[in-house]
Amino acid sequence: MSNKKIGITLRTGNASNYNEQRDMLSQDWPPLLEKIGLIPIFIPNSLEKISQFLEEIEVDGFILSGGDNVGDDPLRDNTEKKILEYTIAHDLPTFGVCRGMQAINNFFNGSVIDSKNSKHVDKPHIIKIVNEKLQQFLGKTIQVNSYHNNTLTSKSLGENLQEFAITDFDNTIEGIIHKNKPIIGVMWHPERTPNKESQLILKTVFCDKDFWK
């Protein structure tokens, strides 16, 4: 069986010493995906016909990558909105990372809160897995990295989304999953800590069809 192709979104930024805007992705992502048998397909932000592009590349799922905040870049916001519309229509697994999880939550009419807790910024911490299906391969607690200033709570959670992971110190939401679509998001960065749990959750989301039954 051939490896699955996974579309992955890109952050934008200015290249130093060049007068041009570029799409960018951390180099941590390709080796992690390669290790678990996934082929990354980069999704540019500047296309006018995004839906047509998504049809033609024929990927098996999507990763909404991290970096910056929802609302900072209208082009990227629009690209990821189109991806979510496409993945819902085609029932393709989608995995949101940090900003990507926030984009999923916003898409389903949720919101994010500016965190006042310094434990969320650049500090690893323990999270509790509160979903039985994910407990089967992640266990009841795992340690994750943390680079985000925004948080989600039960009051800010989007429609048809449910929490599957919460922090052990303030019960803010670190992981969400859609109730009836193959859509999941995490606030930590699996690519920055490519350990067993990071590989397991990605491989399960994209390669285990039974997980979404």
Where are these regions (language model features)?
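N-terminal beta1-alpha1 cap of cysteine-dependent amidohydrolase-like domains
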Residues: 1-99, 106-113, 119-137, 153-170, ...
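Residues that recognize and position ribonucleotide moieties
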Residues: 125-127, 142-145
